[in-house]
Curated annotation (Swiss-Prot):
InterPro entries: G3P_acylTferase_PlsY. One of its GO terms (biological process) is phospholipid biosynthetic process. The gene is plsY. It comes from the Bacteria. This is Glycerol-3-phosphate acyltransferase. Probably interacts with PlsX. The chain crosses the membrane at residues 7-27, 55-75, 78-98, 116-136, 157-177. It holds the Pfam family G3P_acyltransf. The lineage of its organism: Bacteria, Pseudomonadati, Pseudomonadota, Alphaproteobacteria, Sphingomonadales. NCBIfam families: glycerol-3-phosphate 1-O-acyltransferase PlsY. Catalyzes the transfer of an acyl group from acyl-phosphate (acyl-PO(4)) to glycerol-3-phosphate (G3P) to form lysophosphatidic acid (LPA). This enzyme utilizes acyl-phosphate as fatty acyl donor, but not acyl-CoA or acyl-ACP. It is a multi-pass membrane protein. Pathway: Lipid metabolism; phospholipid metabolism. GO terms for cellular component: plasma membrane.
Length: 197
């Protein structure tokens, strides 16, 4: 029974923290409208940027990252050894929030947060990959997907083998949620950062 509770509670904490839709909350509070009716309809920072409010997009990015970071750190403190469960649940919460009928974001910023919390070297590789690909291509989705795929590889190479399975699973989730972006990349029609499409 105790084992079941110690598995369930980290999942609940991770999911609840991860499911807070900061992008939607911030755009509504600042009068920017319903983010789900803007641009791609996604609740993440890239779509917030399409409102023309760069500061709001940066705040969304940091808060989405921060909730993933917080979920893992809190669970590590209370239930040592269960941080991978919290990481999984936090990203799932962001992508499938119950409050928004399970229609959330694509998990890139939150995955960066959990990567940093699991082991900062993994998070550093994630950030450098994301920003590097974004800088070179100016395509947000390509940067995010590249970083997600690199994360489990970095975990394996840097000696964090216990985190490889959860990071690999989350990378697959991120790729799945970007399937429309992948189709547009192949067609050469994926919008670049700054586009309002």
């Amino acid at each position: 029974m105790e084992c079941g509770v110690e598995t369930l509670l980290p999942l609940v904490v991770g999911y609840v923290l991860g499911s807070v839709p900061f992008g939607l909350i911030l755009t509504r509070l600042t009068g920017a409208g319903d983010l789900r009716a803007i641009g791609s309809g996604n609740i993440g920072a890239t779509n917030v940027l399409r409102t023309g409010k760069k500061g709001l997009a940066a705040a969304t990015l940091l808060l989405d990252l921060g909730k993933g970071l917080a979920a893992v750190l809190i669970v590590r403190h209370v239930w040592p050894g269960a941080e991978a469960l919290a990481a999984l649940a936090a990203v799932l919460g962001h992508c499938f929030p119950v409050w928004l009928r399970f229609k959330g974001g694509k998990g890139v910023a939150t995955l960066m947060g959990v990567s940093l919390a699991l082991a900062w070297p993994i998070g550093l590789v994630y950030a450098v990959t994301w920003l590097g690909v974004l800088f070179l291509s100016r395509i947000s989705s390509l940067g995010g997907m590249s970083a997600a795929v690199v994360a489990p590889v970095a975990a394996a190479v840097l000696g964090y083998a216990p985190y490889v399975p959860v990071l690999a699973l989350l990378a697959l989730l991120v790729l799945y949620l970007h399937r429309e972006n992948i189709a547009r990349l192949r067609a050469g029609t994926e919008p670049k950062v700054g586009s309002r499409k």
